[in-house]
A protein has these predicted regions:
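Secreted, disulfide-rich extracellular signaling modules
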Residues: 2-12, 16-474
């Protein structure tokens, strides 16, 4: 086990009572000559251990694609994803008689592609990677009423018989274009997958023959396009973070210009993989040549690695805090400061340090993300932003959590007012055997989005993009 320190400011109040017909002196009788409150501080050691997480919630609007090896821990992380496409509001194509037909006189698409736009990536921009795009099955679509985790099995949803499956090679840096075009903030990096134009033709045909399939995204996904699996099928060295995914169908149609003449113009309809529909990341962490996870407890630090991977479990020493004469004390402030160890490996491709840590009770970790909760400073807390100056994270005041844990254990164990400390300890021991995680919390690297409205300020936390660190205490 490893150590993290918890600093407490504890106040013990002496309560006095008085009865007097003259209420003008009640205050003086209750608090005479001083406030009769004593306060002191104390430092406790917190036990921590590294926990290997098989998976985390996969439902997200941020998708990761690629495969990298963490140079510090030598863990290979591969990520890919399944994505559905949202039907735009008031979706409408030109009237059928306006569409340019093919030689057989049928409506046809000119081309069709999927574009993965990204700004952020990790690793080597020149690494050659392989992407396999596979159509999902209409027989088993991703269900918006279910929760999926990063150990999802994509092959359960793939239509292996689909003629529209494609594979492409790509690199983060597009060497086919001049540097002046691919450098700077104005250039939007993208991976382009050209689908058979027949896919676009079938989509357009469905629109004109079955307009009911295009009433909403639900009907569109179940009857026209269930989505695609974007598989990282080869290569190691880069992992990109998508910012936008669009499926585009290109066509031509007739219209009348300002001069009143018939003219043919190019048209394009985009379907986006947006928050209105599902995207599910799959993450696989392989540990060949890495530190044996079972041996991590023997080290002087604990680890945090995302996506999924490794989290730190921490035990709050409630029994020590409320032992003996401190049982009735109130906790005014409890601060946890966690120091980060510096990387031992010098590499250009080191994963970044997570900006924030979420502390949440171990048994409530799953529900926190599933129900999209916010840190409430009661049973879940968001750390301060990582300070490179102090090289540390800080939870400024977790006093409410400690108080809640004390009350929960007292109620669960059936503690009564007249119980001696020995009696309380016996009851605690029996209750803790049935509730081993009662005072355990998890430290999880998270990405934080700040939202502000007129009367509300919120912080939304979701599992972080690829990061890693290992921490100790002071």
């Amino acid at each position: 086990m490893n150590k993290i320190t918890l600093s407490l400011l504890i106040g013990g109040a002496l309560v006095f009572g008085a009865c007097d017909d003259d209420t003008a002196f009640v205050g003086m009788d209750i608090m005479p000559e001083g406030d009769n409150v004593t306060a002191h501080s104390k430092v406790y050691n917190l036990q921590t251990t590294t926990v290997k997480m098989d998976s985390v919630l996969a439902n997200t609007s941020t998708c990761y694609l690629g495969s990298i090896v963490d140079p510090e821990m030598r863990v290979r992380t591969t990520s890919d994803f399944l994505a559905q496409f949202h039907l735009p509001q008031n979706f409408k194509l030109p009237d059928a008689d306006k569409m340019v037909k093919n030689e057989a006189g049928n409506i046809a698409a000119d081309s069709c592609d999927i574009r993965l736009y990204f700004e952020d990536y990790y690793g080597d921009s020149l690494a050659t990677m392989k992407l396999s795009v596979q159509a999902l099955s209409k027989d088993k679509p991703i269900d918006e009423n279910l929760l999926y985790y990063t150990n999802i099995k994509p092959n359960d949803f793939v239509d292996k018989s689909s003629p529209y499956n494609k594979s492409v090679s790509y690199a983060v840096k597009d060497l086919s274009r001049p540097d002046k075009e691919t450098s700077g903030s104005k250039y939007y990096r993208q991976v382009v997958v050209k689908l058979d134009k027949e896919f676009g033709t079938q989509l357009m045909k469905a629109y004109y023959e079955h307009p009911e399939y295009f009433k909403n995204s639900h009907q569109f996904i179940r009857n026209v396009c269930p989505g695609f699996y974007f598989e990282s099928a080869g290569g190691v060295g880069s992992l990109l973070t998508t910012s936008l995914i669009g499926m585009n169908v290109y066509f031509r149609y007739h219209t009348v210009n300002e001069a009143g003449r018939d003219t043919i113009v190019d048209g394009m309809q985009r379907f986006g993989a947006t928050e209105e529909v599902l995207q599910c990341n799959r993450v696989a962490n392989d540990y060949p040549g890495s530190i044996d996870v079972d041996q991590l407890d023997n080290l002087t630090s604990t680890y945090l690695k995302t996506p999924s991977g490794l989290f730190t479990e921490m035990t709050i020493p409630v029994s020590e805090i409320v032992a003996g004469e401190h049982y009735a004390d109130s906790i005014n402030q409890a601060k946890i400061t966690i120091r980060k160890y510096n990387n031992q490996t010098n590499s250009d491709y080191a994963l970044p340090t997570p900006e924030y840590l979420l502390m949440v009770r171990k048994d409530e970790m799953g529900q926190f993300f599933e129900k999209k909760k916010l840190p409430n400073s009661s049973d879940s807390y968001l750390s301060s932003q990582f300070s490179s100056v102090a090289n540390a994270y800080q939870f400024s005041n977790v006093a409410q959590l400690i108080t809640n844990l004390k009350i929960e254990r007292d109620l669960g164990a059936g503690i009564e007012k007249g119980d001696s400390e020995a009696t309380r300890n016996a009851k605690y021991q029996a209750w803790e055997l049935k509730n081993p995680n009662w005072n355990k919390v998890m430290l999880i690297p998270v990405a934080v989005k700040h939202t502000t409205t007129t009367n509300y300020y919120g912080q939304i936390a979701e599992c972080s993009s690829p990061t890693w660190t290992y921490v100790s205490s002071y």
